[in-house]
Amino acid sequence: MLTNIRAFAQQKSRLSALRLVLAFILGASTALSFAPYSLWIIYPIAMSLALWQSESLNPKASFFHWLSFGFGCFAVGISWVHVSMDTFGGLPLPASVALMALLALYLALYPALTGLGLAWFTRTNSHSLWRNLLLFPALWTLTEWARGWVLTGFPWIWAGYSQTEGPLKALASIIGALGLSFIIAMIAGALALCFSKRYKSLLILLPITAVAAWVAPKLSQIQPTGESVKVALVQGNIPQSMKWEPEALWPTLLKYMDLSREHFDADIIVWPEAAIPAPESMVQDFLDNANKVANLNHTSIITGIISRQQEDFYNSLIVLGNHNQKQQDNPDYESDGSNQFKKHHLLPIGEFVPFQALLRPIAPFFNLPMSSFARGDYLQPNLSALGHKVAPAICYEIAFPEQLRDSVNLGTDLLLTVSNDAWFGTSNGPLQHMEIAQMRAIELGRPLVRATNNGVTAVVDENGNITAALPQFETGVLSATIPLVTGQTWFAKIGQTPLLILCGALLLVGFIRRQKQQ
């Protein structure tokens, strides 16, 4: 008898271990849904198989099942994070990979909480339409939303981003990337029910497909204005190892000016994040001359720079050649804080170090150049460039949809994001970053321009399509004429709030149902 019990326990243990391995593999496969692969169909299929596997699990087992799925998703999907740590942060490769794995494990806690909640709410009915088509999407969406702001947030590879090149992307103009995560989870729930031979659940795909293909475009209030703006996006391709070296400052400035010289016919010239790798006061003569050149050629130059206010330093964007009355009276550049954008959402470790007194002595990784920035205001006016209103986001900020949405208004002509993704080499990180920027264009219904140090530098239309781009890791200038549009998308009007209210209401219903069942 004892032998039989022991054999049964060992078999059950092996099955549990196998389930965790399969969950990890399914999670890892979701990385193929994001750039550069963009195999959008993989995410809902992998999620549906993981959901099907978890149907009969108790809360503890469900937690670890989805923890394994999440760890696979992030360990593979954001494996590029370690590149900056070992290449530029001074950490040995094993240490950088270990830190990346710890980050992936932390991020996996959010899918794990989804699994825990799913099992807790539905212990008596794990095959129901309610569980798969409503409760699971609500839990998944709320945990993804939480991942976007807890501990400053890391809203990378949301499930919704898998649709940036997929057939459902038009829905983002109504419900945003987070709403697409809800839809992906709902589709996964329907597929999981099919594995249990409940085929009628597939009917949920019909209204989703109809809305994506027909209703969403009909609801669009985005219309062309008949006007256009010509832009020139400069990709300097400055080696990251040289970027902050004092002897490289003036060669860098001259390189950007020389590259721009043949494109002074553009309305707006954009240089990337921290293209001028020095405080304004150190390069005042250069700024004065660049301002005069921009005015003489009737163009504007938007450039990344380090600005200073009292004792604080900011990762900023400024506009040279503003053409207002003040500029005409005094052609020199005046650093008065007007027509300037200061980055608000700073990157932990890269731009500020939490517990810096403790962490900075540990390794060079915690002493990266310019890792002591102050935070700009959450809401700042659009930049004005030759009469055009530009809503900016610097690097990491483009991943936060509500922040950019709050900056866009009916008068906004362009979305602008600048970045320096040289930290991540030839990895998938910069390509995923580009994918996120494309989603912001769909959500807000505005063309987007993206200028980077070494790629991806690109122009995106209001539907999220890349219309022009430079090759990565090359020096060059991308020149494009962009048709302007007007109007607001539904997401620009309402944001994520209705979706979050819906998800919260579904959880409340789930709690009431559970209480009644007890």
Curated annotation (Swiss-Prot):
<keyword id="KW-0472">Membrane</keyword>
<feature type="active site" description="Nucleophile">
    <location>
        <position position="395"/>
    </location>
</feature>
<feature type="transmembrane region" description="Helical">
    <location>
        <begin position="134"/>
        <end position="154"/>
    </location>
</feature>
<keyword id="KW-0808">Transferase</keyword>
<keyword id="KW-0997">Cell inner membrane</keyword>
<dbReference type="InterPro" id="IPR003010">
    <property type="entry name" value="C-N_Hydrolase"/>
</dbReference>
<feature type="transmembrane region" description="Helical">
    <location>
        <begin position="22"/>
        <end position="42"/>
    </location>
</feature>
<keyword id="KW-1003">Cell membrane</keyword>
<keyword id="KW-0812">Transmembrane</keyword>
<keyword id="KW-0012">Acyltransferase</keyword>
<dbReference type="GO" id="GO:0042158">
    <property type="term" value="P:lipoprotein biosynthetic process"/>
</dbReference>
<dbReference type="GO" id="GO:0005886">
    <property type="term" value="C:plasma membrane"/>
</dbReference>
<dbReference type="InterPro" id="IPR004563">
    <property type="entry name" value="Apolipo_AcylTrfase"/>
</dbReference>
<feature type="domain" description="CN hydrolase">
    <location>
        <begin position="234"/>
        <end position="484"/>
    </location>
</feature>
<dbReference type="InterPro" id="IPR036526">
    <property type="entry name" value="C-N_Hydrolase_sf"/>
</dbReference>
<dbReference type="Pfam" id="PF20154">
    <property type="entry name" value="LNT_N"/>
</dbReference>
<protein>
    <recommendedName>
        <fullName>Apolipoprotein N-acyltransferase</fullName>
        <ecNumber>2.3.1.269</ecNumber>
    </recommendedName>
</protein>
<feature type="transmembrane region" description="Helical">
    <location>
        <begin position="202"/>
        <end position="222"/>
    </location>
</feature>
<dbReference type="GO" id="GO:0016410">
    <property type="term" value="F:N-acyltransferase activity"/>
</dbReference>
<feature type="transmembrane region" description="Helical">
    <location>
        <begin position="101"/>
        <end position="121"/>
    </location>
</feature>
<comment type="similarity">
    <text>Belongs to the CN hydrolase family. Apolipoprotein N-acyltransferase subfamily.</text>
</comment>
<dbReference type="InterPro" id="IPR045378">
    <property type="entry name" value="LNT_N"/>
</dbReference>
<comment type="pathway">
    <text>Protein modification; lipoprotein biosynthesis (N-acyl transfer).</text>
</comment>
<feature type="active site" description="Proton acceptor">
    <location>
        <position position="273"/>
    </location>
</feature>
<feature type="transmembrane region" description="Helical">
    <location>
        <begin position="63"/>
        <end position="83"/>
    </location>
</feature>
<comment type="function">
    <text>Catalyzes the phospholipid dependent N-acylation of the N-terminal cysteine of apolipoprotein, the last step in lipoprotein maturation.</text>
</comment>
<keyword id="KW-1133">Transmembrane helix</keyword>
<feature type="transmembrane region" description="Helical">
    <location>
        <begin position="492"/>
        <end position="512"/>
    </location>
</feature>
<feature type="active site">
    <location>
        <position position="343"/>
    </location>
</feature>
<dbReference type="Pfam" id="PF00795">
    <property type="entry name" value="CN_hydrolase"/>
</dbReference>
<feature type="transmembrane region" description="Helical">
    <location>
        <begin position="174"/>
        <end position="194"/>
    </location>
</feature>
